[in-house]
Amino acid sequence: MKEKLIDRLTSYVVIDTQSDASSTTTPSTDKQWNLLNQLKQEIEQLGLETDIDEYGYLFATLPSNTNKDVPVIGLLAHVDTATDFTGTNVNPQIIQSYDGNDITLKSGLKIETAKFPELSLYKGHTLITTDGTTLLGADNKAGIAEIMTAIEYLIAHPEIKHGKIRFGFTPDEEIGRGPHKFDVERFACDFAYTIDGGRRGELQYESFNAAGVNVTFNGVNVHPGSAKDKMVNALNLAVRFQSSLPANEVPEHTEGYEGFFHLMELNGNVERAQLSYIIRDHSREQFEARKVKMHEIITSIQNEYGEQAAHIEINDQYYNMGEKITPHPQLIDIPLEVMKSLNIEPIVEPIRGGTDGSQLSYMGLPTPNLFTGGENYHGPYEYVSVDDMERAVMNIVGILQKFEEKA
């Protein structure tokens, strides 16, 4: 199985599939079609029917092999890779029996144990790394390889009973648009799992509540030599707004269930300044309070300088999927049971981010997130354990089998 996983993952990551937030199409980049079309061919070679729509949502079915009435379970992964670092000309490196020391990549870049102490978990494992010049794309191509390998394994082992399985590969997750054209009725599942986590054992069913914020300040630009009581400096208004937010409630000072305000971009001059933020919080109450806080600061500036001086636009992006998943405890209990049977220590923690499951859960498809075995996503230090990819496959198989047993 390890060789199949290596072959699949290395063939997927060399295909550049980065998404593009500035694009208005779906997929946002044509190059995502290259991997989608390859996957369609691979699925058909397994003897399964596939269908892909105009937006690049590739769905397929493994029929049930039991007479029981089993919930239809979906498996999902995304084909696009992050825009944080280049994904062009990925050159994966395979390290057999990792010795536990610093890893020197071809570029000379080092994955140092002092900076990345989790490397100690992988001594003796087969690792796949970058060459130091690109990201790897294990997020989420490791998940794709694991789904494909799990489906192939079930076909080869008909003695493992399971219900109807739907699986799919989707575009544009990394830019937050993965579910925007996702047809839940066409996917036709009771529940689903994204295979989009990281370290072995991760099981995630809580995500942030998320919003995007755009703030604009309009100043009055007057020659500084005669500006008294006339000039309104938009940059100073921007500074006032930012300094009115809690200084410690930012990504670099928060963890776990703690939320934050994150200033993403600042542009401006005396006449006009624009700030872009994201708001994140696991608590819906605190999430709403953060939005109120921003509105209150804007109102105070408007009261002093006029309504035209400040404008804020807040758009909710997604909500904590835990609200939709916890009413279905089997979605959590079954993976926990399977992991323990595989001697995998579960890591149940909130996602400090979002997955496609965050939006899909609110579209009527409760979708927790399972581990893939990867680390340090979105940059040149990214790597994945093939040993843990194999465990991820058996975790998927075990979950599907357990749903059938409990039906």
UniProtKB/Swiss-Prot annotation:
E.C. no: 3.4.11.4
GO biological processes: peptide catabolic process; proteolysis
Cofactor(s) this protein requires: Zn(2+)
CDD domains attached to this UniProt entry: M20_peptT
Leading EC class: hydrolase
Keywords, ordered alphabetically: Aminopeptidase, Cytoplasm, Hydrolase, Metal-binding, Metalloprotease, Protease, Zinc
Active site: D80, E173
Keyword Zinc applies: yes
HAMAP family (UniProt xref): Aminopeptidase_M20 (MF_00550)
Protein name stated in the entry: Peptidase T
